Amino acid sequence: MNRLHTLIDGFSRVRILCIGDVMLDKFLYGSVSRISPEAPVPIMKMDRETHMLGGAGNVVSNLCALGCRTTFISVVGDDDHGRQVRRFLEETHCVPELVVREGYETTVKIRFVAGKHHLLRADQEQPLNMEPELASRFLERVDACLPEADLVLLSDYGKGLFDGRTAPDVIARCRAARKPVIVDPKGADYSRYRGATDRKS
């Protein structure tokens, strides 16, 4: 037990820069007692609704819960969901370095749950295009935050943040700064992560 306490206490000394796709998770809870007369689908009576960080935002929440000093870089839309993501990140006591892109909708995953049954998931999302101007602003954040980090974590959820040159450019900066970079990848093509210190299998 003392060893575990020592390990957990050590987390508070680690400064982690997490970079990844953030999203908002919504859970709609209710009960089903009948089938719709309009179509053979259940009618759910809504009881309550909860919101939380999803994607790489959930990773950040877990790191902060362990006591890690965490800075988080991602892209959100100039919308209510993006502002809600920022508030949730601030509540975890991480440092949110969010790049806001006008015209982009922050990704939201909506899950409908009745009792123990997950009835449906609805996604509100659009592809994130890391065009040159956005990529430049994003990499400026990376350059500004990198010197203070002990470790860099790339959390790829396949929403466009690491498409194109983004992942190689970030990894090159980490290597130049001699910062270890760990990748939690998405998909089967790992070539974009070449040069990373390690990756989750």
Predicted regions and their residues:
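Ribokinase/PfkB-type carbohydrate-kinase core domain
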Residues: M1-S33, R48-G55, V60-S201
